Amino acid sequence: MIDWYSIVDRTRNLRGNSHWDKPENVIASARYSYLLNKWDGQPNYVEVWVEKDALVDIVGQACIPLDTPYFSCRGYTSQSEMWSAAQRFIDQSYRDNCYIIHLGDHDPSGIDMTRDIQERLQMFGADVYVKRVALTMNQIETYNPPPNPAKLSDSRCGKYIDEYGDESWELDALEPSVITNLITNEVTAFRDDEIYQAVCDLEKRGKEELKMIERNYDRAVAFLESEV
């Protein structure tokens, strides 16, 4: 049985305005939304890219707590989106290094996409290293996901078969916990934890200040009205 909460339809969404019962509830919402950029002051800049949109929520489970940007390529990324990505990395060029952690299927196209991302970003002038972390042959041997026949219609199939044989494997076949742990380990390896903790502490103080305002909202309003 699959839990209904595990099924996501990303193409059909109810849209509408947000509402609050009282003004102080807006402050509570702001406190929840108040986040500092955990990569401020870091020597490295990191993004996580995944081949398939179907896996973007699983990737997000790792990236959101790490405050790390993540992106669904949906196959070969469009030229316009690749240009936009290059501009992001160029904007981060003051840092020591920029990295993309890339996850994709182990098939002719999935393997080639890592190369494609690297080369097209370089073409647009971005100095970034694309690190493929999944799916790899070591992971296939470790977790033994079910194989599929390599697509003979793929123009990259010949080179793939010469190197890996006539079987391919999908990233989806890995347990979500394996994917999230893999991303967490890769991202934190590029992060200075001392700098990260300093930003977290500053963020916590900001949230505490907002909570104090929220709790004393009526008194704050009364004071402001008395000053009018």
Listing of model-derived features with the role each one plays in the protein:
Residues 107:
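Catalytic metal-binding/acid-base residues of hydrolase active sites
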